[in-house]
């Protein structure tokens, strides 16, 4: 019997823009957090287990602020993203303190995922229920095999902008069959009077992005292979 899809949430980031654990900051008058909306939508879509990737340094605060509440409704497992969790033959360079990134975060969760199909998201982005329904459908209907049938939920860039500062997005290129061809990360995109523009030189110059541009917000689905 095939395993049910699990939800993996990358929550190791310290939220430096807000001076603390931004995934634990409420976003509405009722004390709900962005991560609460994601988990609720994922559960409604069919997910029954969530794996939180966190740092040891935030373990207690995370469990108290989020984990214990979620444990009432879903199976919960915690894994740590640590620098020394590396493939055989690799070592941490001397002086390295910065986390390796999202791929490494998933590597740290490999044992907890335990061969199940899984979706992975950021802890601090809002995705919407339809996105979780689509990725769950993909993970429960796609036949795994040598062709690696993985998936990403894409968004219209213009629907992911904010009037308050800038956003970082992965600008996607797809072929005529909606197969992902490439992603180019733009770390500073702003809404300038209804026109999305990005800069790579700290605002000295800006380049426009057209309507219809699709972006990644790090909602991926992977089959066991």
What are these regions (language model features)?
Residues 1-15, 29-122, 127-134, 140-141:
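Conserved N-terminal catalytic core of the sugar/cofactor nucleotidyltransferase
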Residues 129-218:
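Conserved core of the sugar-phosphate nucleotidyltransferase
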Residues 54, 221-222:
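A conserved hydrophobic position in a structured secondary element of the catalytic/binding core
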Residues 24, 76-78, 150-152:
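Conserved beta-strand scaffold positions in the cores of enzyme catalytic domains, especially
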Residues 21-30:
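Active-site mouth loops of central-metabolism enzymes
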Residues 11, 123, 155-157, 224:
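Residues immediately flanking
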Residues 15-19, 161-162:
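Short N-terminal binding/cap micro-motifs at the start of the first secondary-structure element
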Residues 30, 175-178, 224-225:
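Short loop segments at secondary-structure junctions
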């Amino acid at each position: 019997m095939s395993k049910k899809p699990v939800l993996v949430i990358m929550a190791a980031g310290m939220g430096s823009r807000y001076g603390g654990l931004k995934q634990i900051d409420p976003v509405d008058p009722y004390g709900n957090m962005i991560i609460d909306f994601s988990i609720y939508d994922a559960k409604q879509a069919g997910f029954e287990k969530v794996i939180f990737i966190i740092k040891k340094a935030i373990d207690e605060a995370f469990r108290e602020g989020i984990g214990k509440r979620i444990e009432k409704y879903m199976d919960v497992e915690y894994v740590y993203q640590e620098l020394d969790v590396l493939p055989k033959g690799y070592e941490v360079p001397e002086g390295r303190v910065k986390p390796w990134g999202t791929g490494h975060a998933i590597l740290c969760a490999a044992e907890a995922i335990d061969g199940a199909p899984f979706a992975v998201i950021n802890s601090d982005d809002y995705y919407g229920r339809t996105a979780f329904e689509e990725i769950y459908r993909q993970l429960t209907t796609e036949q795994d095999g040598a062709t690696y049938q993985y998936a990403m939920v894409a968004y219209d860039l213009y629907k992911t902008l904010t009037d308050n500062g800038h956003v970082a997005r992965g600008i996607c290129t797809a072929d005529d069959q909606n197969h992902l061809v490439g992603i180019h990360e733009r770390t500073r995109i702003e809404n300038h009077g209804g026109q999305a523009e990005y800069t790579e030189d700290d605002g000295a110059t800006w380049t426009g992005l057209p309507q219809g541009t699709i972006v990644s917000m790090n909602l991926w689905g992977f089959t066991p292979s």
